[in-house]
């Protein structure tokens, strides 16, 4: 919901006569809408069946841990901490930025997504690899909602770098880079195999690729 509006705004400036509607939902709903031709595209980090759908890479996404500052676990981890600004600037992509050992947060309360969500699956795996099962106090359906709930300082949450850059900054958060394959994923645009791609669809995909080019 936070990724598409800027792209749609640019697209509408160029093609004002093309009608665009955005639908937000979980993977099950979105795949169903794509299957019955209710939508032309889906943007998702979940892997859809390649025999039914084609895909085009939108971006690489990294999962961070956002922790309210008041938790004592932060006190000895200053060398790992990232600010909202450093995530905006993508400083964490430098090889000198260390990933925090996740086991330091084994006693924290967590706000996570509901079971079955890709972010939840990855969060569970990261915690398991760190040797603990997270103490979950709240389960929600959207990353943005979990992030806003965590901003009340109830607990830590897993959040993608792409969303951190789109959502408001909260001074009482510190962010931590995470290690492991589960902390990195690809985000794709999906569309049905053998479906005719209109010029509008082609132009929209082209604009998403241009928008996501790295800055010089």
Could you describe each region identified by the protein language model?
Residues 1-15, 19-32, 199:
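N-terminal winged-helix
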Residues 6-10, 28-84, 174-176:
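Short beta-strand-centered segments that line the small-molecule binding cleft or hinge
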Residues 12, 54-57, 79, 94, ...:
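Short secondary-structure boundary/capping segments
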Residues 15-21, 133-137, 186-188:
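Residues at or immediately flanking beta-strands
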Residues 26, 30, 35, 45, ...:
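Hydrophobic hinge/microswitch elements
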Residues 46-47, 69-70, 160-163, 187:
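Short secondary-structure boundary segments
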Residues 73-75, 80-130, 197-198:
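Secondary-structure junction motif
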Residues 163, 172-216:
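A late-sequence structural motif
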